[in-house]
Amino acid sequence: VLILYLLVGVALFGTLTSTIFLGLALAGAIKFHRDARQASDALSRVKDFPPVSVLKPVHGLEVRLKEKLEGFFRQDYPAYEILFAADEENDSALDVVREVSVRYAQIPCKILVNGIPPWPNPPAYSFSRMSELAENEILVTSDSDVEVAPNYLREVVAPLLDPKVGMVTCVYRGKNTAGFWSGLTAIGMSVEMTAGVLVANLLEGMKFGLGPTIAVKKEALARIGGYQTLGDYFANDFMIGHLIDAAGYHVVLSQHVIEHVVHQKNFQVMWDNQFRWAKSTRYSRPKGHFGSGLIFALPYGLLGLVAAIALGKPGLGLALLGAAVLNRILESWLVGWGVVRDPVALKEFWLYAIRDFLGFIVWAASYTGARAVWRDSRYELRGDKIVLRKNAGTSQAAGSSGAPQSHPNSHH
């Protein structure tokens, strides 16, 4: 009986902490909208935008690749170039890049083939190679699985006109393209990920980056030692913001919301991605990640329901479960719809309750082992560093070097 009362106590405590987090997320959302209005006012006063270099690694024929690439060629921006990089000359993504770039010949475009990345973190190496050929002072990096609106560059770059700002990053909404499991990941991006970012921005300001978009000044990048500084970190997007903040620059959360295309065809693909993200935050933000175990709601509601029924208090159990479900519905509406405008978060809010329970399982699992999977590579980790990357019969240890192959092609 004592154990059951303890479990009810844990459920009550979890309900309290998740409710406090919901309140903080709401306050963070209010701050986001206030900052967005100020950013829009400042944007309307900008007369001259600096030239920009957009850096985009590509890998294989991803879903909606052509549409995703076209969004970057259709920017309402006066002067910019796009650099693409792949590991192999025969990467099928490069055929799509060439096809799209020919249709937008007015946008300067360069294509690099890097060869096998000699650094444990392949994206960091790819960004480093592209930055060497980038002609402009402002670099905008983005993952290959994002879709952007024509005003993307204007809204992301504008804060960098402030000399004190060294980096800008964005929140994003998930776009499901592959069914139920993919949908869980997508709504997690729109709600859970966004809520965490809003609360961090509210409590301490932005001290990290989000991989789908990072805009950075070359001078700020040079201050932290360039992309090579990130070469053996697992969470290179987090670290670049962390280091630029530590170097004395401001990191800004843009008002722009981008779309992150999610195509995870089955449970295993979804799990590998969720597990990798959880591992990333566990190592890059260990205290915050540990505390995030208290922001889930549904696990505590279910725990309270089971324990209270066992004690003969079904009313209490139903109240705890009801509070948990209501908490997740409100978070889905206030953050998923209210901030990133994800229609799924508004109409299919029940999906986020399932995602919340799954998120707790992933969080707990992140404390097991020291390995993670990304694309066709397996990583062995020690702290926030990669100690070994294995893929397709090859392995790359941290600190080792390789001979990169670079075949830059360009057309104007």
Give residue spans per PLM region.
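Acidic donor-binding segment of Leloir-type glycosyltransferases
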Residues: L69-P118
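N-proximal low-complexity "stem/linker" segments adjacent to membrane-targeting elements
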Residues: V1-K68
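Short aromatic/hydrophobic "clamp" motif used to bind/position activated sugar donors
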Residues: F127, L139
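Cell-envelope/extracellular polymer assembly enzymes that use nucleotide-activated donors
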Residues: P50-S53, E81, M239
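Catalytic donor/gating beta->alpha subdomain of glycosyltransferases that bind UDP-sugars
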Residues: L160-M193, E219-A222, Y227-H289, D384-V387
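Acidic donor-binding/catalytic loop of UDP-sugar-dependent glycosyltransferases
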Residues: S92, S142-P159
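Membrane-embedded multi-pass helical conduit in multi-pass membrane proteins
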Residues: Y5, F13-K31, S292-R371
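Conserved nucleotide-sugar donor-binding
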Residues: E135-E137, L210-I224
